[in-house]
Curated annotation (Swiss-Prot):
Record flagged with keyword Ribonucleoprotein: yes
Gene Ontology MF annotations: structural constituent of ribosome
PROSITE patterns on file: RIBOSOMAL_S21E
Protein name, entry field: Small ribosomal subunit protein eS21
Organism, scientific name: Zea mays
Family in the record: Belongs to the eukaryotic ribosomal protein eS21 family.
UniProt entry keywords in alphabetical sequence: Ribonucleoprotein, Ribosomal protein
Keyword Cytoplasm tagged: no
One Pfam short name: Ribosomal_S21e
GO-annotated biological processes: endonucleolytic cleavage in ITS1 to separate SSU-rRNA from 5.8S rRNA and LSU-rRNA from tricistronic rRNA transcript (SSU-rRNA, 5.8S rRNA, LSU-rRNA); endonucleolytic cleavage to generate mature 3'-end of SSU-rRNA from (SSU-rRNA, 5.8S rRNA, LSU-rRNA); translation
InterPro entries per UniProt: Ribosomal_eS21 (IPR001931), Ribosomal_eS21_CS (IPR018279), Ribosomal_eS21_sf (IPR038579)
Gene Ontology CC terms: cytosolic small ribosomal subunit
Length: 81
């Protein structure tokens, strides 16, 4: 599909689970997307955030908490926070 400027745009861009890399389908109503804010040295929000998407499968298995912790520890090392 094309917009008014002639650029090709997609109507639907599927998300992928951050923990398992599974595609999150439109019918997965148990999936969540979580934004985690970055803090400066004083503990104040600096306007940046990281987004994680978890599928309903991960949440149903009870692995959401450990997956989110693992993903954040990895990301925190990347951004040196």
């Amino acid at each position: 599909m094309q917009n008014e400027e002639g650029k090709t745009v997609d109507l639907y861009v599927p998300r992928k689970c951050s923990a398992t890399n599974r595609i999150i389908t439109a019918k997965d109503h148990a999936s969540v997307q979580i934004n985690i804010g970055h803090l400066d040295a004083n503990g104040l929000y600096d306007g940046h955030f990281t987004t994680f998407a978890l599928s309903g499968f991960v949440r149903a298995q009870g692995d959401a908490d450990s997956s989110l912790d693992r993903l954040w520890q990895k990301k925190k090392a990347e951004i040196k926070q």
